[in-house]
Amino acid sequence: MAVFLWKNLFQTTKGRILQQRRASLYNGAHDYDEELIKKKLQQFAGGSVNLSKEHSGIGILTLNNSRLMNAFTGTMMLELQERVTELENWKDGKGLIICGAGNTFCSGSDLNAVKAISNSQDGMNMCMFMQNTLTRLMRLPLISIALVQGKALGGGAELTTACDFS
């Protein structure tokens, strides 16, 4: 009976902690509107963020946008958030390796998207969206390694700071 209660308490506590990790850090701050920025980011297509999960419990997250030296497009920012959510729910995960396709880790954000998001509120929303995603990545209960081969500029350098090792 005591073992059952302990397991139940542990699962409930673990569930609450994971729910807190998923919650946006910026709900309402600076008029942050996550749904609005998601719609705007969808307009900037290209590249992908791929996740493969090995049976050993190691995940490999690959930034794949070689045309722009793995720069984050709007859809890649959205995919990164989706992959982090997937990792938060991965029960068998032990570690995560983040890498870039080709000879560049990540050259930051796609400057065409940044330029198109020209007003200060949208810029603030994009920054908060990525900060929220990177904070959730940092809080994952996995050992994370940024495998930096080549350049890590701007948002790419920020991505490395969300990892345990680089």
Predicted regions span which residues?
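Charged catalytic carboxylate motif
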Residues: 75, 79, 129, 136
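Glycine- (often His-adjacent) and acidic-residue-rich active-site loop
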Residues: 28, 36, 92, 100-135, ...
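Residues that form or flank phosphate/diphosphate-binding pockets in enzymes
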Residues: 71, 106, 155
